[in-house]
C-alpha cells in the first residue's frame, strides 16, 4: 500500500498544474463537477480541509492540494488507463489452421479516459504467410465485352496455377452484370427485349442486372466451363449497373461463399462507367438501396427494377464491413474515373485492362501483390465525438505522423501504429470502437469508457451528524443540504436568514452583488478573471486599469481595484519606469541637456530638439560654443573672475570647477578658438542635479605677434624687385622688336633691282584721244550722195 501511495504521489506532482488556481476559479461544488473542468483538476474529500465558505478550494491541481495540506489518500483524481483483455501473439510463418491465425494485436481492451486527457496505445499488424484467398471475378457482359469473354475462357486454369505460387488455399468464383432491365437503360420493344442485339444482327441474352453464376470453388476447370457458356447482352447508355453487382457480391456472403478467414478479392472487369445513387430516378425507381442481399432462387438480383443504385457511401460501408478488396480492371478511358473511386474505397486498386482483356492474369497478380504489400487501418463503430490520431511506424522504425498506412511491406513484417484517443466531455456513455486492417477479418475491439465520477461518491452518509443535526448528506467532504437548509454545514434555515449584515450600506446590494449571504456572512463568488474578496465582496484583483491589455501594465498588483506598482515603476497604469538609463545620450548627459526624462523616455523641452535622447536640434546652439563668453572671461581674469564673469557664467548656466576629482568618462570634451587665436580646451559634465560644470580650462597653441619692420622691409624689397624685373622684361621686348624690323628692311633692300628703261615716273607731253562721234567712210559717202 505504501508503494502505491508513493507512486500516486509522484503521479500527482507531475500532472498539469501550470494554470494557477485555474481549477478553483471554476467554482466546482461537487467532486463530479471538479473532474469535468479538466484532466489537471482533482478533488480533496478530507473532512474540514478548507474554511466552510471555501468549498470550491477543494478543487485544484494535485500538487496544490498537497501543498494546502490535503492527505494523498483523500485526493480524488482518476487517471486515464488502458486495460488489455485479450492479447494473443501475432502469428509467425505458415499456419495449418486458418482459424488460429492472428494478424493484429491486441485484440480486445478497455480504455478509460478522463475528459480532456488523451491515452496512446500501440497496435501491431503482421500479415501471415500462405493466407487463404477467395477471388470473385465480376464481369461486364455488355456487347462491347465480347472479345474479352473469349479471352478469359482458360483464365481459371492459368489463374489457379499462378496463385498457387502465392498461396496454397485459393478459390475463385464468377458473376456477371449488364444494366437494370428498364427504360431508358434498354429498348422496350418486344424484339429488343427478347434480343437486345437484334439490330446488329446478333443473338444475345436479354438485359439483366446481376447474375451470380459460380460460387467460390477450388475447381479451376469448373470455372473455365462456366465462362465458356456465357453469352453477352446489351443496353442503351454507356454507364453500366456495376455498382449494383458489387453490392450484391459483397453482402451475399453465404451464396458467394466468402470464408471468414481468407482474403476477399473482388475483380471488377468493365470498359464503361457505372451508375450510382439517384441515376435510377430516370427510370422512376425511387426506393433507396437497402444494402441487403436480394439474390433469388436463380441467383439473380431480384430488386434490380425496384431499388436505386447504391451510393458511393453505401458501397464503401458494405465493402469495408465484409472485408472485400476491390480490383478495378478497366480500359484506358475509364482509368482516371475509377482511380477517383479507389481513393474513396479503402483497399481498392485500379489496373489498366487491354481491349481484349489479354493482360487480365498479370493485372490480377500485380494487384494482389500490391495489396499484400500495404497495411492500412480503418476505424469502425461509435466514433462520434471521439478524437483519434494515428502515427504509423513502418519499415526500419520510420515514423509517419497522421498516417494509418504502411507501404512496401513484406509478408511477415510487422507494422506498428500509435493510436492516440481522447474525449472532450462526459455527455455520452461507453462507446464501442473497432480498429482493423483493411481487407482482413482480424479486429481490435475497444470499449471507451469515460472517467467522470469519484470513488468517494459511492459512500454517502444520509442525514449525517457532520451536517448540523443531520440537515444534509455528507459526501466527498462536503454537505448536500436537505430542502429548507443551506450553508456549508447546513446550519442556516432559509426562513430565518437576513441579508442586512451582508450589505456595506443599506442601499448597496447584498455582498456587492458578487457573493451569497450565508448565515450573515458573504461567500464571494468565484470568477474566471481572478479573486473576489472582502467582507462585502467589494474588492477584487482584476478590475484595475490595463495598459496594452495587461493588468497594471504587468508591472504591479491589483489590490481592491487599484494598481500597486512594483519597485521601479510608477503611474496610474504602472507603465512608467523610474529608471533614466534609456534617457542618457551618447555624450553622457540626460536627454542631451535639452529635455526631461519622463517614464524612461526623453521629453524634449528645448525648441527644435528631437530624437530619442533629444540629440537632434538644428536650432540649438553648440553646447561648447554657448559657454564661450564665460570661458573667455574666466581666462582673461587670470583665475580671479569678477562679478562680470560670474554673471556671464550664470547666464550660460554653467559653473567653473577647479576640482580634479570628477568622472572623465561621462564628460564632454570641447575645443574653441579664442579671440587671440589661442586654442581653448575644457571638459563639460553634469552633476546629479543636472547642472553643467566646466573643468580643466586651458589655452594652448597661441600664435606669436607679427614683426612689423621685417614685414615692411620685405614688402618694399618685393616691390623693388618686381619693378626691376618688369623693366628688364620691357627692355627685352623692345630690343627684340627693333631687331626684327631691321632684318625686314635689309631683306627688302637686297631684293630691289633698277632697270635702264624709261623712267616709270615719266609722263610725255603729247596725248592722243579718239573721237567717239566719228563715222566710217561708207557713212560719209552716203551723206555726200544725198547732198548731190
From Swiss-Prot:
Interaction with HAX1, as annotated region: 731-758
Cytoplasmic topological segments: 731-788
Disulfide bond sites: 23-41, 31-454, 34-59, 44-70, 197-204, 252-293, 394-406, 426-452, 456-476, 467-479, 481-490, 492-519, 502-517, 511-522, 524-537, 539-560, 544-558, 552-563, 565-574, 576-599, 583-597, 591-602, 604-614, 617-620, 624-670, 630-649, 633-645, 678-702
Transmembrane segments: 710-730
InterPro entries for the chain: EGF_extracell, I-EGF_1, Integrin_beta_N, Integrin_bsu, Integrin_bsu_cyt_dom, Integrin_bsu_tail, Integrin_bsu_tail_dom_sf, Integrin_bsu_VWA
Entry-linked SUPFAM superfamilies: EGF/Laminin, Integrin beta tail domain, Integrin domains, Plexin repeat, vWA-like
Signal sequence extent: 1-21
Presence of the UniProt keyword Signal in the record: yes
Gene3D superfamilies: 4.10.1240.30, Cytochrome c1, transmembrane anchor, C-terminal, Laminin, ligand-binding face of the semaphorins, domain 2, ntegrin, alpha v. Chain A, domain 3, von Willebrand factor, type A domain
Topology within the bilayer: Single-pass type I membrane protein
Function comment: Integrin alpha-V:beta-6 (ITGAV:ITGB6) is a receptor for fibronectin and cytotactin. It recognizes the sequence R-G-D in its ligands. ITGAV:ITGB6 acts as a receptor for fibrillin-1 (FBN1) and mediates R-G-D-dependent cell adhesion to FBN1. Integrin alpha-V:beta-6 (ITGAV:ITGB6) mediates R-G-D-dependent release of transforming growth factor beta-1 (TGF-beta-1) from regulatory Latency-associated peptide (LAP), thereby playing a key role in TGF-beta-1 activation.
Protein name: Integrin beta-6
Annotated gene: ITGB6
